[in-house]
Design a protein with these regions (language model features):
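Active-site glycine/GP-rich loop and adjacent strand/helix microenvironment
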Residues: 1-132
């Protein structure tokens, strides 16, 4: 992330404090916005469970696993819980100096094999093919 922030400042002139990052999933209507420390705090109307990659059992905070997003705010489909192919770590809110006390999510990678294409990857491939 830090190299991205340096690149954005060098190429675009955008300071790190002016960069706002979001995390979300197409099937989950909640956006996780970063705080001034660039942590994705979990809003009050959502929950995040980190699950063991092999057993899908919930893990305690601080351990990496699959990101499971939960919210009752879904209106279009009867889906309350979405398991992603993202790897993440859930941290206690008091570990962040920004002042927000809700837990925050750190994305550390993906588990999807390279031959599986997500919606975003498919869209990127189409856009590249258009030479835009």
């Amino acid at each position: 992330k830090n190299s991205f922030y340096r690149l954005a400042e060098r190429v675009l002139g955008i300071k790190e404090n002016d960069i706002i990052e979001f995390f979300g999933a197409v099937e989950h209507p909640i956006l996780y916005c970063d705080c001034k420390e660039h942590h994705f705090h979990v809003p009050a109307y959502s929950r995040v469970i980190i699950r063991d990659v092999d057993t899908l059992e919930p893990l305690e905070n601080g351990k990496p696993g699959l990101v499971n997003l939960i919210t009752p705010m879904v209106k279009a489909t009867p889906i309350l819980s979405v398991m992603t192919d993202d790897l993440g770590v859930l941290h206690n809110g008091d570990e962040c100096p920004c002042g927000l006390k809700t837990p925050f999510l750190e994305i550390v990678g993906r588990v999807a094999p390279e031959d599986i294409k997500t919606c975003a990857a498919g869209a990127e491939e189409i856009i590249r093919g258009l030479n835009v």
